[in-house]
Amino acid sequence: MTVRLKTLYLDTAVPKLQEQFKYKNAHEIPKVTKVSVNRGLGEASQNAKALERSLEELAVITGQRPVVTRAKKAIAGFKIRQGMPVGVMVTLRGERMYAFLDRLVNLALPRIRDFRGVSPKSFDGRGNYTLGLREQLIFPEVDYDSIDQIRGMDISIITTAKTDEEGRALLKVLGMPFREN
């Protein structure tokens, strides 16, 4: 069973991008390679229960068990010692990546209050896109009553696009709702 967004990419995006950018080789056509979901714990780094809740929430949202990221160096100003947990992250590839992107674009983003589209300026210069979410409640998988605190997350969409223009065209064809400036 192929995911809906993957079939959309193969049937619609590939021919559209090939025509738009005049690619001679099929391997030049940009595609999404991975999606990285990251959440910094901040104050909750001392709280083991908050770490557990974050792990559970990201697992429910992404469908994959997150990895705990740990501090590489001690920073006295932030009361962090080396090896302390500072965040959780998930790297999605393949079918899970397409399923997550589909849910993000079609279910989660439209549920944001006063949503007018995502910023078209959040590209990194190499065709990769990053967006930050302020709350986890926009995902339908998260139960409102089960959360202890509203926490956001960063989502990075890594593509094989060479330029921001190619990356923007790819994500637009896949349904990413960019804001018109």
UniProtKB/Swiss-Prot annotation:
PROSITE patterns in UniProt: RIBOSOMAL_L5
Record Pfam families: Ribosomal_L5, Ribosomal_L5_C
GO biological process: translation
Protein's UniProt keywords contain tRNA-binding: yes
Taxonomy, superkingdom: Bacteria
SUPFAM superfamilies reported in the protein's UniProt record: RL5-like
Keywords: Ribonucleoprotein, Ribosomal protein, RNA-binding, rRNA-binding, tRNA-binding
The UniProt record lists the keyword Ribonucleoprotein: yes
Single GO molecular function: tRNA binding
GO annotations of cellular component type: ribonucleoprotein complex; ribosome
InterPro entries: Ribosomal_uL5, Ribosomal_uL5_bac-type, Ribosomal_uL5_C, Ribosomal_uL5_CS, Ribosomal_uL5_dom_sf, Ribosomal_uL5_N
Subunit structure as annotated in this protein's UniProt entry: Part of the 50S ribosomal subunit; part of the 5S rRNA/L5/L18/L25 subcomplex. Contacts the 5S rRNA and the P site tRNA. Forms a bridge to the 30S subunit in the 70S ribosome.
Function as written in the Swiss-Prot or TrEMBL entry: This is one of the proteins that bind and probably mediate the attachment of the 5S RNA into the large ribosomal subunit, where it forms part of the central protuberance. In the 70S ribosome it contacts protein S13 of the 30S subunit (bridge B1b), connecting the 2 subunits; this bridge is implicated in subunit movement. Contacts the P site tRNA; the 5S rRNA and some of its associated proteins might help stabilize positioning of ribosome-bound tRNAs.
PANTHER family cross-referenced by the UniProt entry: 60S RIBOSOMAL PROTEIN L11-RELATED
Family classification: Belongs to the universal ribosomal protein uL5 family.
The protein, known as: Large ribosomal subunit protein uL5
Organism name: Acaryochloris marina (strain MBIC 11017)
This protein's encoding gene: rplE
